[in-house]
Amino acid sequence: GLAPMPKLNALLGAVINIGRSLPFIVLLIALIPFTRLIVGTTLGSTAAIVPVTIGAFPFFARLTENALDEVDYGRIEAILSMGGNVWHVIFKSLLPEALPTLLAGITLTIVMLIGFSSMAGVIGGGGLGDLAIRYGYQRFNNEVMFGTVLILVAMVQGVQMAGDRLVRSLAHR
């Protein structure tokens, strides 16, 4: 790597693996006291931002690491051997080469965030999840349930199609 820090890498890797191993609904409930401390409440869309962000971070961090690891190290060595510095490597090789994979990771993360935000509705996070639970499930209103499911499917399909199109336009395969 450019600036190897094996101890920090091992520590961050362990934290990321722990974060990825927790089911989101468990994390959501476990973070209630922390959310109350940070935001002052555990209800509403503002409160939902805390667990949704903490839940998505390890997933996106691992996708980013994998995207950057895919870049051919020969290109990095070539830039360094021609007198380039770390910034040249980052902006002339790492980011341009990893961009399609990074965008695919961003697309996956956005899709996951849609699901996470819906799950946050279960504990009062608002949004479509709250609508589905309160007005669909608890009131036995199948039309509301199916309507929210259709909206969620449409949102995910739209994000995925746009992300795939963007990745295809930037990939140099």
Annotate the PLM regions:
Residues 68-74, 78-98, 138:
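Short helix-to-coil transition segments within interhelical loops
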Residues 12-19, 99, 103, 107, ...:
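Alpha-helical membrane-interface segments at transmembrane helix boundaries
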Residues 146-173:
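C-terminal transmembrane helix and the adjacent membrane-cytosol boundary/short C-terminal tail
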Residues 46-50, 54-76, 106-107, 114-118, ...:
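Membrane-embedded alpha-helices of multi-pass transport/permease systems
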Residues 116-146, 150-151, 171:
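Glycine-rich helix-loop "coupling/hinge" segments at transmembrane-helix boundaries
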Residues 22-29, 114, 123, 149-153, ...:
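Residue-level signal for the membrane-embedded core of alpha-helical transmembrane segments
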